[in-house]
Amino acid sequence: MISSKVAPGEEEQGESPSKVELGEAEEQREAPLEGQLEAVPLDEAGPSWTTGPPLERLPPLGQEAPPPRRCHTNCLEAPLSRGFQRFGATVGANPWLFLLGPALLTASLGTGLIFLPKEKENLEEQYTPIGSPAKAERRFVQGHFSTNDTYRFSASRTSSETNFASILVVSLANSLLEPEIFKEVSKLDQAVQALKVVQENGTQILYQEVCAKYKTLCVPPNPLLFSWQHNSSLNLSDLTFPIHNTPTQLIYLAGFFGGNVLGQMTGKSQRLVESRAMRLLYYLKTEDPEDSERSQAWLTHFLDHFNDMKSSLTLEEIEVVYFSSLSRQLEFEATSKTVIPLFHLAYILIILFAVVSCSRLDCIRNKMCVAVFGVFSVAMSVVSGFGLMLHLGVPFVIIVANSPFLILGVGVDDMFIMISAWQKTSLSESIRERLSNSYSKVAVSITITTITNVLAFYTGITSSFRSVQYFCIYTGTTLLFCYFYSITCFGAVMALDGKREVAWSRWLEKPDQKYSSLKKSCCVPFGSLIDKHGEDNHPMNLFFRDYFGPFLTTSKAKFIVVLLYIFYIISSIYGCFQVQEGLDLRNLASDDSYITPYFNVEEDYFSDYGPRVMVIVTESVNYWDNDVRQKLDKCMTQFEENEYVDKNLTEFWLEAYMQYMNSSGNNPNDKNTFMNNIAGFLQFFPIFTYDINISSSNEITSSRGFIQIVDVSSSSNKKRMLLKLRSIAENCEVPLMVYNQAFIYFDQYAAIIENTVRNVMIASTAMFIVSLLLIPHPVCSLWVTFAIASVIVGVTGFMAFWNVNLDSISMINLVICIGFSFDFSAHISYAFVSSTEPSVNKKSIEALYLLGYPVLQSAISTIIGVCVLSAAKAYIFRTFFKIMFLVMFFGAAHGLIFIPVFLTFF
């Protein structure tokens, strides 16, 4: 990412052009023996990652040597620096080899892009925890209980999501409990059921053919609407909620009506005074694969023609929104198409930034073309990394589409560092020497930052979310290619451009009557010849040395910085307790998707009642034993007394069976009597057939009941509800299990914090170890750890203020945060502790002078790389920008403001 620039005085001093031909070495230096240090004049050495602190002068003979200033542990860094020095010389001597080799490798690996997935992405597999309890619970339910959607369908008894279409109707008046509004809703219902699909072979698919049925009729989309359609005299002003009693049946209204105003109690229900919204649910056949395929064809037709159908009905009393079991998948796949145009914009912006950053008025030292190729080399790394992963069969998920934007911003940082080091070399040296010197100064630093960032990503492989795993694998691998191409083909391009510098310099110095001095002055400002001793300091470096650094080290500025940090950390900690957990499934679609208003209406009017949860007796127990029944009844009571359960809506076959046995005068405590009467009971209550699993040996191996969940609109309530219900089941004396298909997604709320903390701890530990091994000063490791923790707290806290949930997508960014925090803090703190300045304030100023601009440049380039995602219409892309902006902003603030000030206090 970023690297320390060479210190002032590190520029190689060349001789005048009259003594030495350009492009040739001043003189042949004697190479140091293996293991020896090459002598460097004291005034030419400064702190850098590759040279360490300046060498000490030997004391005069007879005087005691002063104590060393600090511990210096460059046992790994020094050999790496020497190795890169040799490698740079090799690249400089063979530029075409190192240019064409990576190009051929990219072309070869790029063939893997033909394996980009063309099939649907499984949302459950990618965005729910691996090995979650709910998935094991589902396997148990599927293995012990059956359903029948062609004869006796029950939505609460299904173990996985069925095919369905859903319409939410909202009254424009205060209440829809009026005959006129019911007529309009009935007209809408009839139009939906009249939809038919004409297939290519001419056959038709009718709703009545694919609907889930109870006996011979399609399951009603709304039980009250169905009753009113068959009995228009039904008094809509005399209803009770959540269950309405009629002389012939009980009508279950919970979940079908929302925005209710309730009156006085009537038994276990309350009078329904007003209701603002109604739900219509059209369940379709799912169990048989052929039936499911036909159902999905009907649903596709429903989605394609619903808006036209709605317009033709001219609905005046109601507003409607719609959704289907296919919608989430289809809309999620559509979001990937919205981000493709942003790739082009991102590359244009980065190229412009690179050109501006690398342009010089001096046409010899100008590196605009080199910068453009640097961006191109980043694109090569994306092609190579993605191609390799696809060749290896690593799944490409949509969230991976964020990766190229990040790689683009990160990759050009290495380019800036290498160009900066090259500009510090002398034109009097050979190309081989110049590249060797450049590599020795920056390649180790680039290596360290690459290792830390790649380690941060690869720790994401330990996540329980496959989408996080795949994103981290793709991005970490691509970063390795980005690093490899930087030190090979980009270095080769710098070497080739160095030959251009030499050729142009010779042309400018050559007396030629055909070229006027005016033309020469256009290439060399003010007509001066090129400086062979290296480029002068960049104006931004001077800004940090002469203005920003001295200002930041004043007493008033330090006081303000401390207050600012206190405000920052308090706000961040407060935000950490406000952040919402889990991925809201509506966020998988684009902002202008039709499912967004559907979920908004559902949240506004239907959040009071959640799913019906199965309470499953997982083993064979003696139901005829009164003690066992009491234990089971005690557990059911504990469920009903939970704040998230409506105790009046419990459904359990055993309770109904005990009433049946008592009314018939049979003894429920006798095993034979208990078992022999179940068949007769099921004839009266056939729906319970699917709740009792009786083996061939006439033994109840498992059974289930149902409880109604309420008040779980927020992710925190869903998490607490899930954990509480499982705790009750686990502590029950009878072996119990709770399950609903929604738990598959609810499990992410329980797993996300655990996964985030684990990944952050693993990555932070890895960063700490790397800093101890590769940064030659132990004190730096402490400041690196402090900065990582501080930035993570800040990013997490401010996520809440920016309406970003802690989910699998933001968890990726928190892992990224660790790598960037390391980069920003490690360079500044090391430059500080390595400084030879006499006072802490001057040490801080020198650190900012050497590294302030690289830190700022790194942050800006990365933000530019991802800023185009802010224009995306999809949450998963926009969130990536938000968190990366926070990471860059807070990381740069720590590197440029907080750490330089805090270091002066110790």
UniProtKB/Swiss-Prot annotation:
It is a multi-pass membrane protein. It is found in: Cell projection, Cilium, Flagellum membrane; Endoplasmic reticulum membrane. May play a role in sperm development or sperm function. However, does not appear to have an essential role in spermatogenesis or male fertility. Its main location: membrane. Belongs to the patched family. It comes from the Eukaryota. Glycans are attached at N148, N235. InterPro entries: Patched_domain-protein, PTHD_SSD, SSD. The chain crosses the membrane at residues 338-358, 370-390, 392-412, 442-462, 476-496, 559-579, 760-780, 782-802, 814-834, 848-868, 883-903. The keyword Aminoacyl-tRNA synthetase does not apply. PANTHER family: PATCHED DOMAIN-CONTAINING PROTEIN 3, PATCHED-RELATED. It comes from Mus musculus. Residues 1-70 are annotated as: Disordered. This is Patched domain-containing protein 3. Residues 339-496 form the SSD domain. Expressed in germ cells of the testis (at protein level). GO terms for cellular component: endoplasmic reticulum; endoplasmic reticulum membrane; plasma membrane; sperm midpiece. Keywords: Cell membrane, Cell projection, Cilium, Endoplasmic reticulum, Flagellum, Glycoprotein, Membrane, Transmembrane, Transmembrane helix. PROSITE patterns: SSD. Pfam families: Patched.
